[in-house]
Amino acid sequence: MMKYKVIALVGKAGAGKDSLLDEVLTGNLGKYDLHEIVSYTTREPRQGEIDGFSYHFVDKYTFADMVHDGRMLEYTKFNSWMYGTALDSLSTEKTNIGVFNPAGIISLMNRPDIDLYVIYITATDKERLIRQLTREENPDVREILRRYDADEDDFYLFEQHTIRKLVHFTRIENGDHTFYDALDALEKTLDKIV
């Protein structure tokens, strides 16, 4: 059976997952030769997001067809939007890296064709809130609060139960004034995995 090597970054909203991923891919793509996993979603693009780069933006019918046809490795619903990772988003020749939520991690854990390495990015609530409020010109405060509430439930179960079942697990703190320390820790972890 063919196995896909997947490095999954996971963390609450505003923890810095995407920023760390961008730094690793842009600064060290040649060093690690990583394949970035681009997920699918049915939501509208946010300011600055590009189809095929940030996400594959598809309508709900296309997404439903992909689920029905067994092309999705994992998927989940947030509000009325669907998010997921398709099998065709993975490379068999390179180590794959992407951002996942706790439900996605659980789905990947249960797949025999995935060799999973989880890196949990954490930050204080204050730091996360500051990042989310300053990320966009006109942030949707209600959406930020909704994501905070959802994270409390999702990550409680993840922290209490899922982490114990992971074979390959690393926690990295990306708090106040520690971005480059977190990046350094991430690179050291990647050196061991890749």
What residues fall within each predicted segment?
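ATP-binding Walker
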Residues: A15
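Conserved phosphate-donor/acceptor-positioning beta-strand/loop module used by diverse small-molecule
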Residues: I97-N101, R111-L133
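ATP-dependent small-molecule kinase phosphotransfer cores
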Residues: T41-N96, F100-P102
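Short beta-strand-centered segment that lines the nucleotide-binding/catalytic pocket of NTP-utilizing
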Residues: K31-P45
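NTP-dependent small-molecule kinase module
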Residues: L133-P139, Y156-V194
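Hydrophobic anchor at the beta1->P-loop junction of P-loop NTPases
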Residues: L9
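Walker A/P-loop
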Residues: D18
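P-loop (Walker A) phosphate-binding loop of NTP-binding proteins
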Residues: K12
